[in-house]
Swiss-Prot record:
This is Protein CDV3 homolog. Keywords: Acetylation, Cytoplasm. GO terms for cellular component: cytoplasm. It comes from the Eukaryota. Residues 185-196 have a biased composition (Polar residues). The gene is CDV3. Residues 1-204 are annotated as: Disordered. Its main location: cytoplasm. Residues 1-15, 74-90 have a biased composition (Basic and acidic residues). Pfam families: CDV3. The modification N-acetylalanine is found at residue 2. Residues 27-58 have a biased composition (Low complexity). The keyword Protein biosynthesis does not apply. Belongs to the CDV3 family.
Length: 204
């Protein structure tokens, strides 16, 4: 039983590896078509170098072929990066954006303000605070007429003993203490039976 499970797992992974190889070969075929133009340029450059410097001795015949293929791969990668480095200028004249150029002097000042100094406690007052919305002068507020509200004076405590607000004299009148609830009262505890009696009395 264990052998069949191992075989099925091996088959599964073998199929998966074949799919990966096919995908890689498909990618390499697409890359090869783009690399063919790059390799022709690289081979012409290599031919010119060989003519200028003469043939180079190699350790083995296969190593020279491997070096040329790796050189073409490097030149292909460099060509790819060169394509991304080239940027086209974009025309922003159609946009309704104001000119956003900063003079070098303002840029230097902002860099000085952003750089933290070692003795920040000493120079915290020396930071340029002249620019910003907080320095704009606001119109003077209208003078506010202060209305004097006279509060009734609180009664003076004699005796120096604290009394909570509920126990003080002159407070709210106390509610009469309520006794225990009347459980059998229909007004305090209405029941469905009493409502049924009420409905029956309405019918007649």
């Amino acid at each position: 039983m264990a052998e069949t499970e191992e075989r099925s797992l091996d088959d599964f992974f073998a199929k998966r590896d074949k799919k990966k190889r096919k995908e890689k070969s498909g990618r390499s075929a697409a890359a090869a078509s783009t690399a063919s133009s790059a390799s022709s340029a690289a081979s012409s450059a290599a031919g010119a170098a060989a003519a200028a410097g003469g043939p180079r001795p190699t350790d083995g015949g296969g190593s020279g072929a491997a070096a040329s293929s790796s050189g073409s791969a490097k030149s292909k990668e460099e060509d790819d990066w060169k394509e991304f480095e080239q940027k086209e200028e974009i025309d922003y004249s159609g946009l309704r954006v104001q000119s956003m150029q900063i003079s070098e002097k303002e840029d230097d000042e902002s860099e000085k303000r952003e750089e933290p100094s070692d003795n920040w406690e000493e120079t915290s007052g020396a930071v340029d605070r002249s620019s910003g919305p907080w320095n704009k002068s606001a119109p003077a507020p209208a003078p506010v007429v202060e209305t004097i509200v006279t509060e009734p004076p609180e009664p003076v405590q004699t005796g120096g003993v604290y009394r909570p607000p509920g126990a003080r004299e002159g407070g709210r009148p106390r509610r009469a203490q309520q006794g225990p609830p009347e459980i059998y009262s229909d007004t305090q505890f209405p029941s469905l039976q009493s409502t049924a009696k009420l409905v029956d009395s309405r019918k007649y």
